[in-house]
Amino acid sequence: VTSTDLDSAPPELRDRLNLLMGVRARAIRPGHLELAQDVGARFHDHRGQTILGSVGVLADACPGGSLGSSVPEGTGMVLSQLSATLAAPMPATGVVVATGDATHLDLDAGMGLASGTMRDGAGTPLAVLQSRGIVVTRPRASADTVLSGERLPIPDPEPCAGVDDLAGRIGLDVVDALASGQIARGPLAGLLDLQVTDVERGSVAASFAPQDWMSNPLGSIQGGVLVTAADLMNGLAAQTLTATGQQYRILDLRIDFVRSPAVDGPDIRAVAEVVRAGRRIALIESHLVDASGQTLVRAAASARLS
């Protein structure tokens, strides 16, 4: 199947979240997917930049979908781990094209591996993806709603921070001002309604509430939304290290999906901490936990400071 939209794609790729994020199918065959997403102001962080989290749903859907298209009908598979190693910076506007290929499938063991790439419209490499999927037997409690083809309303994006808001500040002051609402948190954090609550040098805490639009067919939050939250948090932790005029960029992210948060569950707390900071590279660990303190997601990232 080749398509410029999701109308002819498998149901798993026609869910409301893919439609909301503008993810569309370019090519589909068993074990292989090519998807695309337009990027721009809707998905920018507070700096007005496209980051990995801007295409988190795409990053999850592409390798995950390649595995899903490889298993027998009626078999469910979700990602348990996803890693992304970034090359060139994500484009501020334009298109990001992701390809995913199932590289190993062992139904007896109940798992599979997939790899993929992300490129811009000119073919420039943006990221290399690796993922592990596991077979699940949970009922698809929200499938009828999520896969109905309903198009959710696209919210108006929140503003980015102004140039004057960022100029002349060390990064810690920027993140402090973001937490207090003195500067805008940006469209991507606004989409999640991510509320930064605590800020120290090398440490940031925040929370967000699960929302219905985040659901996958199983009734839990789609992994790409969790990628977005973790990437935003890791970036903010990196920014607390920056001097006036210094920039940061996440270079890689490895995320383990430990437990599946329900879309009707309690608020999720997110914490990111720098575990080592050199002159040019910082190593960051982040966790998403539920109200009882159980780990939902753990992630590790490296950031470049320049």
What are these regions (language model features)?
Residues 178-260:
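Structured core of small recognition/catalytic domains
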Residues 64-97, 235-268:
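Hydrophobic beta-strand-centered segment that forms part of the acyl-chain substrate-binding groove
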Residues 9, 20, 32-66, 211-235:
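Hot-dog-fold acyl-thioester-processing enzymes
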Residues 65, 77, 90-93, 103-168, ...:
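HotDog/MaoC-like acyl-thioester-processing domains
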